[in-house]
UniProtKB/Swiss-Prot annotation:
Keyword Phosphoprotein included in the entry's annotation: no
Gene: atpF
Main localization category: membrane
Database matches in Pfam families: ATP-synt_B (PF00430)
Stated name of the protein: ATP synthase subunit b
Topological relation to the membrane, as annotated: Single-pass membrane protein
Keywords in alphabetical order: ATP synthesis, Cell membrane, CF(0), Hydrogen ion transport, Ion transport, Membrane, Transmembrane, Transmembrane helix, Transport
Function: F(1)F(0) ATP synthase produces ATP from ADP in the presence of a proton or sodium gradient. F-type ATPases consist of two structural domains, F(1) containing the extramembraneous catalytic core and F(0) containing the membrane proton channel, linked together by a central stalk and a peripheral stalk. During catalysis, ATP synthesis in the catalytic domain of F(1) is coupled via a rotary mechanism of the central stalk subunits to proton translocation.
NCBIfam families membership: ATP_synt_b
Family label: Belongs to the ATPase B chain family.
Amino acid sequence: MFDINWGSIIYQLIAFCVLLWLLSKFALKPLMGVMEKREQMINDQIDQADKDRKAAQEYLEQQRLAVEKAREEAQEIVQKAKKLSEQQGQEIVEAARAEGERLKEAALAEIQREKEQAVASLREQVASLSVLIATKVIEKELDEKEQEKLIAEYLKEVGEEL
């Protein structure tokens, strides 16, 4: 039946082993090196992506905190501005009140001065008229001393009436 050729089988087996050894020496090792480099590169990229993701999360958290802090600072600035505006409003009202009081006092002082001037002017006119009337009534010349006495009495009477 079948006759097995052992020499051919051994030759093919040796040739296969030599081919396997050559492939492993020159093809498989460089191919495995490329595969290992590729695997390492993929692992490095995954690690870098994880680092980048963590860094992005940290940056996002920092930005969130910065926005929150800025919001708080803005709220604080608004509160300070409101407080300052209320304080300035009160100061303006107080200044206006004080100015009004000062103007009132000045007006009262001016009225008092004008009243005193009017009274003095009236006294002078009354004194002049009194002298004229007294001169005509008495029909005599008064000396200066008597005239002053008469004026003082008349002014005293006029002052009491005022």
